[in-house]
Amino acid sequence: MDPNCSCATAGDSCTCANSCTCKACKCTSCKKSCCSCCPPGCAKCAQGCICKGASDKCSCCA
């Protein structure tokens, strides 16, 4: 189990390489943003963020 991922997945392995489906996912291997309103390059989004409406901004990515 990936210590940076708090979500339990099949096989005890983190499978958020393509998309994060759990709010608490902190996988370092997550290539896409865990937050739909954040750009893929924002590393902070894997630590959790709050989207502000339908805008492309969120609490951790300005």
From Swiss-Prot:
Binding site for a divalent metal cation 1: 5, 7, 22, 25
Residue numbers binding a divalent metal cation 6: 38, 42, 45, 61
Gene3D superfamilies: Metallothionein Isoform II
Family: Belongs to the metallothionein superfamily. Type 1 family.
Gene Ontology biological process: cellular response to cadmium ion; cellular response to copper ion; cellular response to zinc ion; detoxification of copper ion; intracellular zinc ion homeostasis; negative regulation of growth
Its biological purpose: Metallothioneins have a high content of cysteine residues that bind various heavy metals; these proteins are transcriptionally regulated by both heavy metals and glucocorticoids.
Domain writeup: Class I metallothioneins contain 2 metal-binding domains: four divalent ions are chelated within cluster A of the alpha domain and are coordinated via cysteinyl thiolate bridges to 11 cysteine ligands. Cluster B, the corresponding region within the beta domain, can ligate three divalent ions to 9 cysteines.
Pfam family, one: Metallothio
Residues binding a divalent metal cation 3, per UniProt: 16, 20, 25, 30
Keyword terms: Acetylation, Cadmium, Copper, Metal-binding, Metal-thiolate cluster, Zinc
Native source organism of the sequence: Oryctolagus cuniculus
Domain of life, per lineage: Eukaryota
Residues that coordinate or bind a divalent metal cation 5: 35, 37-38, 51
Stated name of the protein: Metallothionein-2C
Keyword Lipid biosynthesis recorded: no
InterPro entries: Metalthion_dom_sf, Metalthion_dom_sf_vert, Metalthion_vert, Metalthion_vert_metal_BS
Modified residues (N-acetylmethionine): 1
